[in-house]
Amino acid sequence: MPSHPHLWFPFTSVKDAPDPLKVVSGKGARLTLADGRELIDCISSWWVNLHGHAHLRIVEAIAQQAATLEHVIFAGFSHEPAERLAMELCKILPEKLTRVFFSDNGSTAVEVALKMALQYWHNLDQPRSRILAFDGAYHGDTFGAMSVGERSLFNAPFEKLLFSVEFLPYPETWWGDETVEAKEAAAIAAVEQALAAGDVAAVIIEPLVQGAGGMRMARPQFLQQLAARVQAAGSLLIADEVMTGFGRTGAWFACQRAGIQPDLICLSKGLTGGFLPLSITVATEVIYDTFCSGNPDHTFYHGHSYTANPLGCAAAIASLELLLDSEAIVQGLEDAHLPGLELLAQHPKVTRPRLTGGIAACDLVSDRGGYLDPIGLRVRQAAIARGLLLRPLGNVLYLLPPYCLTPTELQDIYAAIADLLDEI
């Protein structure tokens, strides 16, 4: 049981969990513990850190902004960091995404997108309210986000309170998968059937990679077929890029790598480089225009106390600048992982290896499987003993490190993982 008398930790079994490791500092890809040990942050501290901890350029941007304007209400007021961030983002986003709405985290970015999609149809006086999502999806822990996520132990206590969503098969794939085309065909057939009635408001998907659902990967071809069907049905496509955005898939955004154009996109995690909580939902001008009629009923009545926080915006601007400077590194992420993952894939305890950009994953052979598989905790503990921060999703082992990690360091991590798999 965690020893602190007042803290309550997320996603942690209160009775069974070992004491948390106390971190005193971070620099680059490394974290320093209170006892002096160092860990390589192989998962970007829950997928948020892009450039490494304590990156001076982001530190200075936050400090300068804090000395100028730390926060101001964003209703009826604006400020330069928000305006500049919106302009810079729209230069790199899929071209039709032009209207930026700020909130606080990935869950709220999804909530905003769902509300925008549903109110879009309300504003048009068209009775569309059906939402389609995918098996294995995870979109966050607030009620709307839970509703569009797979029913699981994460949301089981609240299931009766979640709104109705239709879930479609997700054609996950991996290296050597000979059934992927059949799975995609079945998934598209299910999409077509669900869209046939013409009353679907929106379809939401994590493009290319489902994160917390197990780093389940899909091919661009499937996304392209999906987007075409959704567009033909007149429905809206919501891309949840909370995890995949800002280079994680080897492109600025997974939508761009997949060659699709969403109507709404949800961004967070890497938005500020991992320094501060901030999220953004970006909509097309077509959606935005339905909120501009002058009818008070068409106003988007949604906001947060820290909407468009200037410190977060300043951090995000600095992070975008760093991404522009390291674009070649982002484009080379997949090549950097490839040798190590190919070697790891030969291990007898590894199955279903898969790779998209800088997101590498595999399943560990286990009798149980699933999020509560105890093999995950054994891997975590063995990794810490080797100076690595890993947090498997049950029997799903993955790497999602910050971009500052060198290819040599990455190969050393793969070798250490192979070594620990020999022992657990």
From Swiss-Prot:
Q: Which GO terms describe its cellular component?
A: cytoplasm
Name of protein: Adenosylmethionine-8-amino-7-oxononanoate aminotransferase
Q: Which reaction does it catalyse?
A: (8S)-8-amino-7-oxononanoate + S-adenosyl-L-methionine = S-adenosyl-4-methylsulfanyl-2-oxobutanoate + (7R,8S)-7,8-diammoniononanoate
Q: Which prosthetic group or cofactor does it need?
A: pyridoxal 5'-phosphate
Localisation per UniProt entry = Cytoplasm
Site described as Participates in the substrate recognition with KAPA and in a stacking interaction with the adenine ring of SAM, positions?
Answer: 11
Instruction: State its Enzyme Commission number(s).
Output: 2.6.1.62
Q: Which PANTHER family match?
A: ADENOSYLMETHIONINE-8-AMINO-7-OXONONANOATE AMINOTRANSFERASE
Q: Which InterPro entries match?
A: Aminotrans_3 (IPR005814), Aminotrans_3_PPA_site (IPR049704), BioA (IPR005815), PyrdxlP-dep_Trfase (IPR015424), PyrdxlP-dep_Trfase_major (IPR015421), PyrdxlP-dep_Trfase_small (IPR015422)
Q: Spell out the subunit comment.
A: Homodimer.
Q: Which residues carry this modification: N6-(pyridoxal phosphate)lysine?
A: 269
Mind listing the UniProt keywords for this protein, alphabetically? Answer: Aminotransferase, Biotin biosynthesis, Cytoplasm, Pyridoxal phosphate, S-adenosyl-L-methionine, Transferase
| Keyword Ubl conjugation set for record | no
- Provide the residue positions that the database annotates as binding pyridoxal 5'-phosphate: 106-107, 240, 304-305
User: What does the sequence similarity comment in the record state about its family?
Assistant: Belongs to the class-III pyridoxal-phosphate-dependent aminotransferase family. BioA subfamily.
Name the residues that bind substrate. Answer: 46, 138, 269, 303, 391
Give a short account of what the protein does.
Answer: Catalyzes the transfer of the alpha-amino group from S-adenosyl-L-methionine (SAM) to 7-keto-8-aminopelargonic acid (KAPA) to form 7,8-diaminopelargonic acid (DAPA). It is the only aminotransferase known to utilize SAM as an amino donor. Complements a bioU deletion in Synechocystis PCC 6803.
GO molecular-function term, one example from the UniProt record: pyridoxal phosphate binding
Q: Does the keyword Transferase apply?
A: yes
